[in-house]
Amino acid sequence: MRKTKIVCTIGPASSSEEVFAEMCRAGLNVARLNFSHGTHAEHQQKFDMIRKVRRELELPIAIMLDTKGPEYRIRTFKNKEIMLKDGDPFTFTTRQVDGDETIVSVSYAGLANDLSVGDTVLVNNGLVIFEVENIEGTEIHCRVVTGGELSDCKSMSFPHKVLEQVYLSEQDKDDLLFGIQNGIDFVAASFVSRKQDVLDVRRFLDEHGGRDVEIIAKIENQTGIDNVEEICQACSGIMIGRGDLGVEVPFAELPAIQKYLITKCRLLGKRVITATEMLESMIHNPRPTRAEISDVANAVYDGTSAVMLSGESAAGKYPVRTVQTMAEIVEETEKHIDYEPLFRAEAFQIKNMVDAISHATCCMACDIHAKAIVVSSLSGATVRMVSRFRVPVDIIGMATNERVWYRLALSWGVQPVLCEETFTSTDVLFYNALRAAKKSMHLQPGDNVVMTGGNTTGTSGNTNLIKVETI
């Protein structure tokens, strides 16, 4: 069973039922809808299509809404585009002006208050670089450090700066409400810099019927990296947004940052998605480059929970083949990883009963060479805790409702199984767990299965039992 999950962005190339169904069969686990693009009407068609296909295929396909987030952009130029040279003076203004070779308006009204002399301003994904020399009222006077072409509405970023713009925009709120109405499983919150950003999203979801929607914080700047531990306290996991991150930090540091973030999340028991340009060349070509193959494999070696496709699956020529290729690379890489010694050597923090039971379950499964671990969980929390230890044993996550079943699709090494029966006793609980293991795996007489769960009070967080069964 493939352990590392695959997140796919759904766009024009993958919006038909036929193509999406083939992607699901090829290995798609989570369908991502990017709300930086498209209208609600267009996204409604995607929501309807995803729900229809996953119901027909009887597969636990989760739905992720990716927010636009707090974006900063230049506005427009009289002639659509300009060319700047190194050393040119240039002004950003919060006034409305017709842009030219000397000045352009910006989308964020408070920018002049948040920047300081000496700050760096990156435009167009960091291709054009400015240094702030003076600020007068609404005018931010800069010097061009690295020249290049600028055109309408290009993105801006500010390395090592936390701007004071309100994190949740009205558009993001409208999008979240729309997503809640459509039963989303995850929110990927863009440009998270601090714990409070996640808490703002959490509060909004809780107040509008999205209490069970899990938050994935997108780490896309240096401040997010610096605050990742406190951010993880408030969310279910992170996404390593290597595109914007590669603009904000020196590109040569990206591999080390990726390894650091993956390790941090794994030790904290949080999911981590590695994203951006993993198989970028397959937007146009039927085969990946050798470098892309190594990139995907290295993320798997690092221990990522999931790898993600963006333009490859949303707008590429070969969406199904791209998923097949991703799954093939992941599966082949996992064959060459000896997970047990890595698990034994790791210094995990055991903070509570669920942590302790989950760790003991994994130790026992390795000690007796179990064929499967079966975890019964009301909320999915115990399944996630077992998943964090990255053991070689296949994990079957038993969900008692569809919402949890879908969300388990993003957990490393977990095969979600839906069992909506009421567990009236621990005997019934473990009977159903063993039945799920037999149904999901090719077990032979003599095979050991380790099962864990809680009492049958119907209260989440009561995991306190371990049982070993021999087939």
What function would you assign to each model-found segment?
Residues 1-471:
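Non-catalytic helical/linker scaffolds that mediate oligomerization, partner binding
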